[in-house]
From Swiss-Prot:
Classification via Gene3D superfamilies: Hexapeptide repeat proteins, Tetrahydrodipicolinate-N-succinyltransferase, N-terminal domain
HAMAP family, A to Z: DapD
Protein name, entry field: 2,3,4,5-tetrahydropyridine-2,6-dicarboxylate N-succinyltransferase
Gene name tied to this protein: dapD
Organism annotation: Rickettsia bellii (strain RML369-C)
The reaction(s) this protein catalyses: (S)-2,3,4,5-tetrahydrodipicolinate + succinyl-CoA + H2O = (S)-2-succinylamino-6-oxoheptanedioate + CoA
Pathway: Amino-acid biosynthesis; L-lysine biosynthesis via DAP pathway; LL-2,6-diaminopimelate from (S)-tetrahydrodipicolinate (succinylase route): step 1/3
Length: 275
């Protein structure tokens, strides 16, 4: 690992000259390919939780950006589509049955996963798009027309509902991607972006839009927070009224309740949202 970090950091310092040195570039491409393969395996991650805090491995982002910079686009095609891109699909079109059995996933027609993405066992991928650097942990469903942005981190046993957008980020290097922790539900057509963290067990209703500057309001106390959906919260869309009655209110996300983990495990999503 240290060797990768050292090579990536050194290459980053001379990235503008890298393409001019064919010998050095050829050797370095092997390092980049190794990093991409380790992203595929989940042994390297863009972002990791350390001591209860999420830390960005910015050298991995640099590796992905260098991969884009040093890779030539090529033509890809299958039986019904063609495209021209620098990033190969994670699952080749001629992939054999054993590859999917070994992965332990379910992947339906219309789904697209770029290489450099980790997909854990028992993940279900409906027709959706998962970008490079993303990490999808065990037992999660990525539902129809959901998009998972570059480097986004999705935990275990999550449901990312139909049409949901989970934002990613490659630049700035220090910025966190969107992080959805274990056992979360993100409702249909919601959008979580700009490095927001949805903590474990949270339930986000349909049609909720949360970015870094979105006000997240506790309904009971009126307290306003930003950038984090607290663990086991139930969140719905809302409006903060204007103090002046003739002026428009502003959109917000509202925490209508928080439940303990035992209740969250026993009670259905619909019950939480409707009660």
């Amino acid at each position: 690992m240290f060797t990768y970090i050292k090579e990536i950091e050194e290459a980053w310092q001379i990235k503008d000259k890298l393409l001019q040195d064919s010998v050095k570039l050829s050797a370095f491409k092997k390092t980049l390919q190794d990093v991409i393969e380790n992203l595929n395996k989940g042994t390297i991650r863009v972002c990791e939780k350390q001591n209860s805090s999420w830390q960005v491995n910015d050298w991995v982002k640099k590796a992905i950006l260098l991969y884009f910079m040093t890779t030539e686009s090529q033509l890809y095609n299958n039986n019904y589509n063609s495209w021209y891109d620098k990033v190969a699909p994670k699952f080749p079109f001629d992939a054999e049955l054993n590859k999917f059995k070994e992965a332990g996933i379910r992947k339906v027609p219309g789904s697209f996963v770029r290489t450099g993405t980790y997909i854990a066992k028992n993940v279900v991928i409906m027709p959706s798009f998962i970008n490079i650097g993303a990490y999808i942990d065990e037992g999660t469903m990525i539902d129809t027309w959901a998009t998972i942005g570059s480097c986004a981190q999705i935990g275990k046993n999550c449901h990312i509902s139909g049409g949901t957008g989970i934002g990613g980020v490659l630049e700035p290097l220090q910025a966190k991607p969107v992080i959805i922790e274990d056992n979360c539900f993100i409702g249909a057509r919601s959008e979580i972006a700009e490095g927001v963290i949805v903590e474990e067990g949270a339930v986000v209703s349909m049609g909720v839009f949360i970015g870094a500057s979105t006000k997240i309001v506790y309904r009971d106390s009126g307290e306003i927070i930003y950038g984090i959906v607290p663990a086991c919260s139930v969140v719905v869309p809302g409006v903060l009224p204007n103090k002046e009655a003739d002026k428009p209110g502003l959109y917000c996300a509202v925490i209508v309740k928080q439940v303990d983990k035992n209740t969250r495990a026993k009670v259905s999503i619909n019950e939480l949202l409707r009660s």
